[in-house]
């Protein structure tokens, strides 16, 4: 009892201060740097949710997905299709994005968790390619490569700054739920299977069932991000389910730092900034971006979150996990 | 001395397991009575671990039948067996290395209580209290907040043993629970295991290379050689058995 209190209650205040500080900083940038700043903040926030959804799988379930964009894309299309094909009012259609992504996660996840490690990863890739192909080629329904456009005013007509603020609130809710998942009995089960499936099994867990639950939760939140992205731009394209977004998510998680809850958040922040600013500075931006990523990984083997934690430790400001 | 008769808790009939051409278990028949502390001994490669894994449902492609409390458990998955009362440890200990000792034990209790789908902090706190209590019992309280990866091998084994107890199993399978421990640690752990088995009336099947520990703890001993059972008996009978002596003298150690 004592041990638990000493460990869990003390840093809670610091955690809340940290969150409040981060929100204040983002909101300040959002309000003080004009339209381009707001657009950037909104993108960062959406990517934070997307990367954090993958982080649940990778950092805690030790499941590497090479096809996470499938659920991002399904989120966009669930929302857009509900409006364009089923005449659902746009506000109500918001739930169909995460819902479709969750269902996609259930179907593909049930398939993928039958395999482990690299075979699991290859199956997730295959599932994502199937999703992409369907979105790309089913012209009558999904609009094919021209995607779905013009079905709503982007951002529901909100100003860039107000949309970014609204996205921030939603992102906070998502991250809080993910945090609760990680620190719940379910989270412990997900981590158990991730670290030693045979031990977990011998204790009485069905590894596949646990992994499927993690997969569906992860897909659902990727779907939230995808839905937000579709609202942000007022469209949905097959590329949202493509390799580009899959790769972005992977880079953000690894850059941010595996085995850390905030890995996806830090990764999304830094990677989105780099991706937006490096091309402005040099024509060889892909090379420069690659070198910067390489440097970060070399300097901080535990990613940005690990680096931040170490820095916080040096400043005597621990417990930033 | 008369053996106390009680129901058979585990029965294996005609167990056979092959790895390609290699026969790891060859037509093994085995009976285990409730309340026994049964040692499984034999030279390296005899098939002891293979047998344990067969019972725990962790091996594919096993021929023959395994009955647990009279029911065929051959088709059950390991996690189902765990909930029916079979707990085990592995020869090379398996724990959640990146988690703390307390988290490991809490995970074991959460899983045993089948409350892993819960999102409630209160559920976690309740299992954590049970876990902290078990850590006290197995003497790992001081280590509660250390990562298992930073623990010496002997303590990892002790932790794994505690985790196997979380489900309060009727049958405890321990595969070399004292490997890598000092002689003192070995006796300490196995005395504790024996006490606990006696106090709770559960059944123990354990693989052990230290013959002193076996003779001290076990109520029955089975000797395996080359995938088969050589002989089964009381510790005294086994110690006096010429064939067993030949097998052990013929071994390199
Ligand atoms: N996965 C496997 N593939 C091939 N052969 C295996 C496999 N597992 C075990 N064996 C072989 O089966 C035989 C029995 O192995 P087992 O681990 O059951 O022996 P053991 O009695 O536990 O020995 P030890 O005292 O060394 O632990 C050994 O010869 C081993 O090499
Ligand atoms: Mg063995």
Regions found by a protein language model. Give the residues of each.
Chain B
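Glycine-rich phosphate-binding loops of nucleotide-dependent enzymes
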Residues: 2-253
């Amino acid at each position: 009892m004592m041990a638990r209190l000493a460990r869990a209650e003390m840093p809670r205040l610091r955690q809340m201060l940290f969150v409040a500080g981060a929100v204040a900083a983002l909101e300040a940038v959002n309000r003080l740097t004009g339209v381009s700043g707001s657009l950037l903040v909104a993108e960062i926030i959406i990517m934070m949710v997307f990367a954090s959804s993958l982080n649940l799988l990778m950092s805690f379930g030790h499941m590497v997905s090479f096809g996470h964009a499938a659920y991002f894309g399904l989120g966009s299309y669930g929302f857009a299709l509900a409006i364009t094909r089923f005449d659902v009012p746009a506000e109500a259609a918001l739930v169909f994005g995460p819902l479709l992504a969750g269902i996609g996660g259930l179907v593909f996840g049930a398939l993928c968790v039958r395999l482990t490690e690299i075979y699991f990863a290859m199956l997730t890739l295959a599932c994502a390619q199937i999703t992409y192909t369907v979105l790309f080629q089913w012209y009558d329904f999904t609009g094919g490569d021209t995607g779905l456009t013009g079905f709503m005013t982007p951002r529901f007509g909100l100003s860039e700054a107000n949309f970014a603020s609204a996205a921030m609130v939603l992102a906070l809710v998502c991250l809080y739920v993910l945090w609760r998942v990680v620190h719940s009995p379910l989270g412990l089960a997900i981590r158990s299977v991730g670290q030693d499936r045979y031990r977990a099994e011998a204790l009485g867990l069905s590894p596949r069932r646990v992994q499927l639950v993690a997969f569906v939760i992860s897909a659902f939140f990727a779907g939230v991000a995808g839905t937000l992205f579709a609202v942000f731009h007022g469209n949905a394209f097959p590329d949202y389910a493509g390799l580009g977004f899959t790769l972005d998510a992977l880079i953000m998680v690894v850059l941010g730092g595996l085995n850390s809850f905030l890995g996806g958040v830090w990764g999304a922040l830094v990677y989105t900034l780099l991706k937006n600013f490096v091309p402005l500075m040099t024509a060889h931006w892909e090379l420069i971006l690659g070198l910067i990523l390489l440097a970060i990984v070399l300097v901080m083997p535990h990613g940005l979150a690990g680096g931040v934690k170490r820095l916080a430790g040096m400043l005597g400001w621990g417990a930033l996990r | 001395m008369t053996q106390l008769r009680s129901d058979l808790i585990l029965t294996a009939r005609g167990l056979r397991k092959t790895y390609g051409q290699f026969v790891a278990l060859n037509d093994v028949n085995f009976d285990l009575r409730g309340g026994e502390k049964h040692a499984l001994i034999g030279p390296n490669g005899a098939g002891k671990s293979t047998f344990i894994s067969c019972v725990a449902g962790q091996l594919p492609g096993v021929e023959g039948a395994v009955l647990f409390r009279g029911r065929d458990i051959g088709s059950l998955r390991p996690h189902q067996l765990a909930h029916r009362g079979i707990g085990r440890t592995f020869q090379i200990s398996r724990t959640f290395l990146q988690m703390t000792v307390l988290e490991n034990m809490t995970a074991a209790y959460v899983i045993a209580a089948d409350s892993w789908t819960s999102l409630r902090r209160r559920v976690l706190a309740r299992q954590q209290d049970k876990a902290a209590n078990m850590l006290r019992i197995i003497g790992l309280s001081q280590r509660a907040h250390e990562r298992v990866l930073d623990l010496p091998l002997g303590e990892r084994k002790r932790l794994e043993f505690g985790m196997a107890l979380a489900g309060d199993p009727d049958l405890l399978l321990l595969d070399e629970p004292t490997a890598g421990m000092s002689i003192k640690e070995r006796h300490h752990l196995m005395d504790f295991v024996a006490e606990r088995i006696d106090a709770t009336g559960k059944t123990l099947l354990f693989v052990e290379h230290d013959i002193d520990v076996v003779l001290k703890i076990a109520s029955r001993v089975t000797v395996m050689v080359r995938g088969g059972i050589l002989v089964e008996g009381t510790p005294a009978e086994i110690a006096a058995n010429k064939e067993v002596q030949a097998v052990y003298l013929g071994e390199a150690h």
